[in-house]
Amino acid sequence: YINSPESVDRGYITNEEIHTMMNTDMPDKTHELVRDLFIFSTFTGLAYSDVKNLTEDNLQTFFDGNLWIITRRKKTNTESNIRLLDVPRKIIEKYKGMTRDNKVFPMPSNTTCNKKLKTIAELCGIKSRWTYHVARHSAATTVLLSNGVPIETVSRLLGHTNIKTTQIYAKITAQKISQDMEILSHRLEDMEKNICNAIQ
């Protein structure tokens, strides 16, 4: 039996690692840019090629008055509409006007991004092997699912053609299970008390 890419345990970064990354001084502007792009993808779920192809035209104020990315995934040509949170909005503002040809970001090559991410992980004292694609997995796991966003919404945000794909990406953390059971425990407190009393 050979592990297909679909069944491989997918890596992601944790909240703590995101904070460490943002609070670690970067050695130069390129490392800083790569870090910002990685965080941008962590908060939007966009893959490298989709961030690279992002133009000002993809940024639209939508029906709810918020800024959205309206785009199609390069890999699958599936529509992907993402309402922007504050973090990616701030990153877009930071790099505004730095590119020609209407692109949102001055994007280094994927190889450069992965090399710089390796250095950034070392600077942060993190042993995990980071590649740019880890950001997309982290969006599914750390940002969206761990904070209670329903899997159907995550699937649409990531532009998946099939919810099964989202289930592969979305490794629910033990922490999330613990939090959910804690909430459930509070909700069931009275019921459990009555049953436990009856068990004695």
Task: Tell me the role of every PLM-derived stretch.
Residues 16-17, 41-64, 152:
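Short, charged phosphate-coordinating catalytic segments
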Residues 33-34, 107-111, 127-147:
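Short basic/aromatic active-site micro-motif
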Residues 184-200:
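C-terminal secondary-structure termini that scaffold catalytic or DNA-interacting sites
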Residues 39, 43, 49-50, 119, ...:
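C-terminal catalytic core of tyrosine-transesterase DNA break-rejoin enzymes
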Residues 1-48:
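Basic, Lys/Arg- and aromatic-enriched nucleic-acid-binding interface segment
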Residues 7, 74-93, 99-119:
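C-terminal catalytic core of Y-nucleophile DNA break-rejoin enzymes
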Residues 111, 119, 124, 196-200:
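Acidic, low-complexity interaction regions
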Residues 73-77, 110, 158-183:
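Catalytic-site neighborhood detector that most strongly recognizes the C-terminal catalytic loop/helix
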